[in-house]
Amino acid sequence: GIDTWGVDFGLIDKHGNLLGNPVCYRDARTEGMPAEVFKCMDEHRHYAETGIQVMPINTLFQLYSMKQNQDAQLEVARQLLFMPDLFSYFLTGVANNEYCIASTSELLNAKSRNWSFDTIHSLGLPEHLFGKIILPGTIRGTLKEDIARETGLGAVDVIAVGSHDTASAVTAVPAAESPIAFLSSGTWSLLGIEVDEPILTEEARKAQFTNEGGVDGKIRFLQNITGLW
């Protein structure tokens, strides 16, 4: 299984080829994009659907920047794969989107745990980019024959873990018996709790809380705060 940081992605074409290297979320292309996006939709309603804190780095704003700049990759792309989805695709040839990593995009409906097609349509993004959502624990596929042969591993299954690194970190917290708060530190520090349902109130939006997907049907209700970068 593979986990990585959130929001970043690669685009593959109809032949299954990667269309250029993924762009880091710290690239300046998303500057000013939230203001542009919320000319197309209501920010309050958007949070009530996605439950995600508005941050310029999020996938939504990366894609809208590409659209605004008429990026040729967006015109010919067949599917979007987040970083762990992309590496799993390289290993198996199977393209799908794991739930936890997809939830970081600001393009997922927090209640249905499927794509927010209202958001996608409002921004004029190609619907076909957004593939099947799979849950942690799903078998993505088996190693490609050439990789299995080169590594000597044979037909090993590749599993969809909690593919956002924080989702896997929180799952490993040894505190199953009682409610706990967690602090996961790295590039960012993520301070929060696990809940069964997203918290989509106006108070949560104003306080800049985010609802990210977790393992075993949980929601990670948290804040992004200062980390090590």
Predicted regions span which residues?
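Gly/Ser/Thr-rich active-site cleft segment
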Residues: 46-166
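Gly/Ser-rich phosphate-binding catalytic loop and adjacent alpha/beta segment
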Residues: 30-33, 39-40, 52-56
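Short, small/polar residue-rich loop motifs at catalytic or cofactor-binding pockets
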Residues: 4-6
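Glycine-rich phosphate-binding loop of actin/hexokinase-like ATP-binding domains
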Residues: 8-36, 77, 81-116, 153-229
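A short beta-strand-loop micro-motif that forms or neighbors metal/cofactor-
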Residues: 43
